[in-house]
Structure formats: C-alpha cells, structure tokens
Amino acid sequence: FIPVEVMLMPEASPFHLSKVSYWSRTVMVPLFILTSLRVMAKNPAGVNVRELFTVPPEQQRDFVPVASPLQHFFKGLDAVGRSFEPLIPQFIRKRAIKKAEAWIIERLNGTDGIGAIFPAMVNVYEALGELGYSPDHPYRADTRKAIDDLIFDHGDAANVQPCAWPVWDTCLGGLALQEAAGTGDTPAVRAGLDWLAARQVCDGPGDWRDFHPDLPGGGWPFQYANDHYPDLDDTAAVAWAMYNTGDHATYGRAITRAMDWLIGMQSKNGGIAAFDSDNNHEYLNAIPFADHGALLDPPTADVTARVLALAGRLRRAQDGPFIRRALAYIKREQEADGSWFGRW
C-alpha cells in the first residue's frame, strides 16, 4: 500500500520519490493513481499463469516474504496505512492525483514513452485512461504507439522487449570496430559517432537536476530518446569511442561536456551509479512493494570503473580529485576473493 499522497511529501521525507531509482519512479507514479482509484484489472481473454502457483492465486494472501526486522516493521506499517486510508480527506487526494498527473505528463517523452521502458508505459496508459483521457488523445495515443513499438508479433506468438537500446549498441559496436580495425576512425565508426553526437542531452529538464541544478548536461540516454534520464554508463562509453578517433575538433566539446557531467554526478561515497547520485537509501528495499530488491540506483563498482577508465584516457589535470575518490570507492568495494560485483 503506497497511497498517491506520497506525491505531496517534502524532499526531506524518508519516502520522497527522489529516493528511488528512475525506473521505479516512472512505474510507481501511475501505479499510485491506479491503486488510489481502486482500478480493477481487465483480463477479457482470461490470460493467466495459474500453473506457476502452488497455492491458487485467488487464495494467496502472503505474497511478500519477510526476512528481517525492518521488513516486519514495514509490513505492519502497510497494514496500518490501509486501515487509515478512508480517513484521507478527498481534497488532499485530489491534489495528490493532480500532482501525479502533472509529473507524468512532464515526462511522457512522445512516442518513445515515459522513461522509454515498457512497464512504465503500460501503467501510464492505464492511469491516463482512468483520469479521463480518451485513447485518441495525443498523450495516450503516443504512449500506445511506444508500447506497440516494443511488441514483436510472430503470428502464432508474440514477445515484448522492455526497451530499445540503440545508443548502447551503437557505441559498443563502434568500440569493437575501432579495436578490430586498429584505428579509431573508419567510415562506419564515423557514421555511428555522428549519429550519437546529435543525441547528446545538454539542456532541458531531467530528474538528475533536482540535486545538481547548476550542473551542465552532457549525457546520452540508453534509448533513442529519454532526455529526462541520461545514462552515465552509456555516456562514458560514447565519450570513449569519440576520444579514440583522435578527431577532437569534431568531438572534443561533446567529450568535455560528457566528462564534466559524469564528474558532477559522482556520489558522496566516490562511486558512480547508472542514472542518479546518492540513490542508496537501502531501507526502501525492505518495503513490501520492493519485493524484487531493485528499487534503488546506488553507485556500483562496474560503472565507476568504466568512468574511471575514461578519465584515465582523457588525462585531464582537473579530474584528479574525482579519480582519487573513485579509486578509494573501488578499493572499498572489492570482495574478499579479490573480485568486484558487477550490476550492469
């Protein structure tokens, strides 16, 4: 139980939206609306996965495993919250729903979809419908197209991919071609990097700006377009491939903006995350909603190491403090057997 009134909590609140990852935010906000309006799921075709349940799903009551005192606490808090929900004044609920609606609309992202990820798009499509938007309204129509673009129909079967990842594929393909050719600049590599250069996110809104309002942009998203949520890992890879060309007249400004943005996004512990800074509020992974254990976007050794590698290539004198803090983080994160955990 997470009521839509969460949208009204101040930034200092332990449950403020900014304390979870971007993918969690974009999935949760429309879900707040759907749960607060008590929307019933529609399943006219009767699709189900009953064979996966040892207890019939309609009889199952305890979906959330509890393994720690904190999980016990949040499960109790969940029960208390449900019992008090009817006491929430309607004017507060309406205000919270309006704020959630505005949050969604700002991030709709056209036909690329909110967050450019399938789960968020589906929730948004349904939430907008419950808020009175017709299927042919541009907000819903664009969202539906974003969903349909991720569905692959094979006639007797269909599959859905969670997102598209052309920036990642293009920069990794470019790096592979550079390695194979023994040179950083070939026509194929140049074509890919020029395509990428036009997609660098330098201006405009982004959730990362909530904590870095004065930091100039310079990242790339994972997908075709996802300006609110550029990806630090992708940004390092693109800048690396651009640097390898040796053509700093063409790509130098993009590389500089990318590295400056990456440094500005360093977390307080010295590490680098995928999309955010200091998104390491581990207690939130104990709430019942976070049964998958991936609610957060904390710094990780693998992303930090790749950004460090880029900094080593660029050899900029001003990056020394960043490098020292990142190296200290990497050393602290080493496992007892000498390895490092790789999330991404």
Question: Residue ranges of each PLM-predicted region?
Answer:
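Preference for long, amphipathic alpha-helical scaffolds in soluble/luminal domains
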Residues: 1-344
